[in-house]
Amino acid sequence: MTMTLHTKASGMALLHQIQANELEPLNRPQLKIPLERPLGEVYMDSSKPAVYNYPEGAAYDFNAAAPASAPVYGQSGLPYGPGSEAAAFGANGLGAFPPLNSVSPSPLVLLHPPPQPLSPFLHPHGQQVPYYLENESSGYAVREAGPPAYYRPNSDNRRQGGRERLASTSDKGSMAMESAKETRYCAVCNDYASGYHYGVWSCEGCKAFFKRSIQGHNDYMCPATNQCTIDKNRRKSCQACRLRKCYEVGMMKGGIRKDRRGGRMLKHKRQRDDGEGRNEAVPSGDMRAANLWPSPIMIKHTKKNSPVLSLTADQMISALLEAEPPIIYSEYDPTRPFSEASMMGLLTNLADRELVHMINWAKRVPGFVDLALHDQVHLLECAWLEILMIGLVWRSMEHPGKLLFAPNLLLDRNQGKCVEGMVEIFDMLLATSSRFRMMNLQGEEFVCLKSIILLNSGVYTFLSSTLRSLEEKDHIHRVLDKITDTLIHLMAKAGLTLQQQHRRLAQLLLILSHFRHMSNKGMEHLYSMKCKNVVPLYDLLLEMLDAHRLHAPANFGSAPPEDVNQSQLAPTGCTSSHSLQTYYITGEAENFPSTV
C-alpha cells in the first residue's frame, strides 16, 4: 500500500484553508470536512467533544487581511523539510499537528478538554470571540460560544463549594421568607415601617413629619386640588396632602403606648417580667395590639359571661336610665344678637361638649363595653349625630315650634333662618318632635330608642368597601334583641294589647329612619360650614365629622360651594376608626371639663 506524500506548497495551502474556514464569519450553518480515514492519534475520539481554543498569551491580529497565497509561518513553528512532510501530513490531507510543546503559540491549537471548559479566548481589544469548534459524530461545525465558564483544577473542591453555595442560598431564602412575614410598610407613604408611631405603622420620615405638624406650624396649603399622590418618592412634594393622609390612615396625637410613658425603668421592668414567662420579649407592635384589641379568646370568654344577656327588662331599663348624660348649658349671651357665625359657634361648642359625655354614656350602655374597641369606636362614629338629634327632639317635646338645644338656648324657626341651609333641618326636627308628642313617648322608650340607634348604626357597613366590618355582629344583634324585648315589655306593662304593641313598636322603629336622614343632612350642612370657614370646629367634633365622611358614600361632600377654597377641603382631623381611641385609652373623656 502506497501513501501519497503532499508537497510543501499543498500542505501550506491546506493549513491556510483550515485557518480561513475557522475565522471567516458564519455565512453558512455548518462546515463539514470529509474524512477519508480514521484520525491520527493526536485527534480525540469522535464520541468526545473537542474544543478549539487559543492559549493565553497568544496574539493574533484579526483585522489584518489574510494573504492571497499562503500565511507566513516561522521556521521554528512549522519546520518543513524533505523528510518531515510525511510525518507532518497524512494521506487524508489533514494529518496530525506537531505536539504543542514543539511549536510557538499559534492562532489554531487543538487542546484536550479539561474537566471544565477553558475560559474562552479573549480578543486583543477586550471582545470575546463568539465562535469555537465542536466535534460531533457527523463532523466539525462552527458554533456560537456560550457564556464563559472558568476552570477550577480541583473538581472535588468545586462540588463542595457548590454544596456550600446551595446551602447558604437555601438558608438565605428561608431567612428572607421569615423576614418577609414580619415586614411592615408605612401606612402613609408605603416605605418600610420603623415601628408603630402615633397609632399606625409608619416610617421614621412620616413619624417625624407628623410630630412636627402637631407640635408646631401646620398651616399647609396644597398648590393643586388636595389630591396629591403621597408615596415613597413624592411624600415631600406636598405637605398639606401628606398631613391629610396621615390623619386619614389614623395617626393621632394621643396614639402613644402606655408602656412608653414610664421611661426606661418601666421598659426594663416589662422585659424582666416577660423573661420569667418566655425567653424573648414581646415586639412593640404585638404589645400595642394586645393593649388595644382584645384577643379572640378573650373576646369569646367575655361574650360567654356577658351579664347583659341575663338582665331582666326592668334591670335593663334601670341601667339605661342611670347611664343618661348630665344636662349641659350653652354659652349663649342674650345681650348679643344672633348671626350666622355666632349661632354656629354656639351649636358646635355645645355639640363638642355633648360628644364627650356621649362617650361616657355609651360605655354605660349594657353590652357596649363587651364589644371590641374597634366596634365601639365604629358605632359611635356612625351614630353620634343621630344620638344628638334624638336627644334634641326629646327635650323639645314640651316646646311646640321650638328646639331646646340647652336649658338656656331655645330657638324657633325664624331664628334658625340666620344660618344658611338651617331652616330645612329645623323643619325636619320640629316635625319629628311633633310626632313624638303625638305618640306620647315615654322616657323609658326614649332611652331604649337611643341605645338602638347606637348599636344599629354600623351593623350594615355597605356605605364603604374600604372599612373593616364589625367584629362582634352576633353579640350586637343579641343586645339589640334584648333592648327590643325591653321595649315590648314596657308596652305590655302599659296595658296595650298585643296588636297595639306591634303597631307602636313598628311606628317607633320607623321614626329611627328619619333620624338617619336628618343626620345625613346635618353632616352635609356642617361640612359646608367648615368649608366656608364660618366657624372653627373643635377637636372632637372635627374628628367625628371627618370620620363620618370616611364612612359615608364617595359622593358625600363632593360638591362644596363654588366659592370655597379647595385647600380647605382636606380633613384636618383623624378620619379613621381610631379617632376615639385616645379617649378610651387615656380616659380623657372622663376628665373633660364641662358646664353643667
UniProtKB/Swiss-Prot annotation:
Transactivation AF-2: region residues: 312-595
Keywords noted in UniProt: Activator, Cell membrane, Cytoplasm, DNA-binding, Glycoprotein, Golgi apparatus, Lipid-binding, Lipoprotein, Membrane, Metal-binding, Methylation, Nucleus, Palmitate, Phosphoprotein, Receptor, Steroid-binding, Transcription, Transcription regulation, Ubl conjugation, Zinc, Zinc-finger
Region (Required for interaction with NCOA1): 36-48
Residues where Phosphotyrosine is found: 538
PTMs per UniProt: Glycosylated; contains N-acetylglucosamine, probably O-linked. Ubiquitinated; regulated by LATS1 via DCAF1 it leads to ESR1 proteasomal degradation. Deubiquitinated by OTUB1. Ubiquitinated by STUB1/CHIP; in the CA1 hippocampal region following loss of endogenous circulating estradiol (17-beta-estradiol/E2). Ubiquitinated by UBR5, leading to its degradation: UBR5 specifically recognizes and binds ligand-bound ESR1 when it is not associated with coactivators (NCOAs). In presence of NCOAs, the UBR5-degron is not accessible, preventing its ubiquitination and degradation.
GO cellular component: chromatin; cytoplasm; euchromatin; Golgi apparatus; nucleus; plasma membrane; transcription regulator complex
Compartments reported by the entry: Nucleus; Cytoplasm; Golgi apparatus; Cell membrane
Annotated ranges, domain NR LBD: 312-548
Stored Pfam families: ESR1_C, Hormone_recep, Oest_recep, zf-C4
Region (Disordered): 144-175, 259-285
Annotated Basic residues bias: 259-270
Modified residues (Phosphoserine): 104, 106, 119, 168
Coiled coil regions in record: none
Gene Ontology biological-process annotations: androgen metabolic process; antral ovarian follicle growth; cellular response to estradiol stimulus; cellular response to estrogen stimulus; epithelial cell development; epithelial cell proliferation involved in mammary gland duct elongation; estrogen receptor signaling pathway; fibroblast proliferation
Lipidation (S-palmitoyl cysteine): 448
Region Self-association, residue ranges: 265-595
Record SMART domains: HOLI, ZnF_C4
Region (Mediates interaction with DNTTIP2): 186-311
InterPro entries given in the database record: Est_rcpt/est-rel_rcp (IPR024178), Estr_rcpt (IPR001292), Estr_rcpt_N (IPR046944), NHR-like_dom_sf (IPR035500), Nucl_hrmn_rcpt_lig-bd (IPR000536), Nuclear_hormone_rcpt_NR3 (IPR050200), Nuclear_hrmn_rcpt (IPR001723), Oestrogen-typ_rcpt_final_C_dom (IPR024736)
Bias (Basic and acidic residues) ranges: 155-166
Binding site for 17beta-estradiol: 354, 395, 525
Function, in words: Nuclear hormone receptor. The steroid hormones and their receptors are involved in the regulation of eukaryotic gene expression and affect cellular proliferation and differentiation in target tissues. Ligand-dependent nuclear transactivation involves either direct homodimer binding to a palindromic estrogen response element (ERE) sequence or association with other DNA-binding transcription factors, such as AP-1/c-Jun, c-Fos, ATF-2, Sp1 and Sp3, to mediate ERE-independent signaling.
PANTHER family linked: KNIRPS-RELATED PROTEIN-RELATED (PTHR48092)
Annotated domain remarks: Composed of three domains: a modulating N-terminal domain, a DNA-binding domain and a C-terminal ligand-binding domain. The modulating domain, also known as A/B or AF-1 domain has a ligand-independent transactivation function. The C-terminus contains a ligand-dependent transactivation domain, also known as E/F or AF-2 domain which overlaps with the ligand binding domain. AF-1 and AF-2 activate transcription independently and synergistically and act in a promoter- and cell-specific manner.
UniProt name for this protein: Estrogen receptor
Source organism of this protein record: Bos taurus (Bovine)
Taxonomic lineage of the native organism: Eukaryota, Metazoa, Chordata, Craniata, Vertebrata
Record gene name: ESR1
